[in-house]
Amino acid sequence: MDLKDGGGSERRGAAAGAGAGAAPLARQGSIYSLTFDEFQSTLGGMGGGLGKDFGSMNMDELLRSIWTAEESQAMASASAAAAAAEGGLQRQGSLTLPRTLSVKTVDEVWRDLEREASPGAAAADGGGGGGEQQQPRRQPTLGEMTLEEFLVRAGVVRENTAAAAAMVAAAAAPPVAPRSIPAVNNSSIFFGNYGGVNDAAAAAAGAMGFSPVGIGDPTMGNRLMSGVAGIGGGAITVAPVDTSVGQMDSAGKGDGDLSSPMAPVPYPFEGVIRGRRSGGNVEKVVERRQRRMIKNRESAARSRARKQAYTMELEAEVQKLKEQNMELQKKQEEIMEMQKNFFPEMQKNQVLEAVNNPYGQKKRCLRRTLTGPW
């Protein structure tokens, strides 16, 4: 397997791949077309040297350094007016890493790629046997490989089906040497087709689109998110996506649960894989809670009404008893006045009789006169 030739074929098939299948994204002159050595020197020129070799980085750190270089390039080339109008280029979140791949270093991934490429290269050399012995092909080093080719072979991104077919058709074209990074205008870098920039302009500029792992093509029926996402120096477009959850294809090396916790999430999901399910269940819970609150309020209102009615009844009874008490007191006073006015003489006569006859009248009683004769 000729790794260098594979990277050149990708660049040679850019113009032809733009016209077939899904809308490809412009990446001509982007960070991804640089080799590791050129990228290292570019970081040093931007003042963003990490002080650390790429081989000792893990894949998460490599992607973060690529995003940092893109942001630095966009900020250095954008004018103040364009930055105020367009908001600037934000860090791309279209690349996700499987969890098993994010913890590996670049050297470990490169050794795995070399082991995978060795049997294929040996079979290709043996299949072309004949009278003359072929010269052994020199395998490219890590520093000579472009970032895009490394990410594609490592399984981080995968090429579009239409772009791959166009790349095979344009394999006879002369290779294009890597160019220096031109100034990028923020006015032409955007997310989605918002203005007058269309996919035809990106195709005329020699654009090739590639999408991250787990983003399905429209021709595949795996219920993945349909659309493409890429990073380029000319234009960036993102097609509308379907947020239904599905399993990744074979290039994703697993389902969505293996995504790196440190990698940015490219698209929002309406559902969740683990934990509580959202949607109808949440609406039912909220509705039950609202009904319970309404019932509690009605019960409290009824209790307050009963208490108020009982209090008013007690107050009315107390008022009635007070009125009856006042009437009885008035009657008692009237009776006392009548006794003082109408019975004073009777009382005097009774006193005089008691003085004159201290013993009172003689009491009558039965006396025994005779006894029976016997």
Curated annotation (Swiss-Prot):
Chain segments carrying region Disordered? 1-23, 117-142
All copies of domain bZIP, residue ranges: 286-349
Family, as annotated:
Belongs to the bZIP family.
Q: Tell me which PANTHER family the record gives.
A: ABSCISIC ACID-INSENSITIVE 5-LIKE PROTEIN 7, CAMP-RESPONSE ELEMENT BINDING PROTEIN-RELATED
- Which Cys residues form disulphide pairs? none
For this entry, the protein name equals bZIP transcription factor TRAB1
User: Could you tell me the keywords of this UniProt record?
Assistant: Abscisic acid signaling pathway, Activator, DNA-binding, Nucleus, Transcription, Transcription regulation
Tell me which species this is from.
Oryza sativa subsp. japonica (Rice)
Q: What job does the chain carry out? A: Transcription activator that mediates abscisic acid (ABA) signaling. Binds specifically to the ABA-responsive element (ABRE) of the EMP1 and RAB16A gene promoters.
Q: Where is the composition biased (Low complexity)?
A: 14-23
Subunit text: Interacts with VP1 (via N-terminus).
Q: A Gene Ontology molecular-function term?
A: transcription cis-regulatory region binding
Where is this protein chiefly located?
A: nucleus
Pfam families referenced in this protein's UniProt entry, alphabetically = bZIP_1 (PF00170)
For this protein, the record's SUPFAM superfamilies field holds: Leucine zipper domain
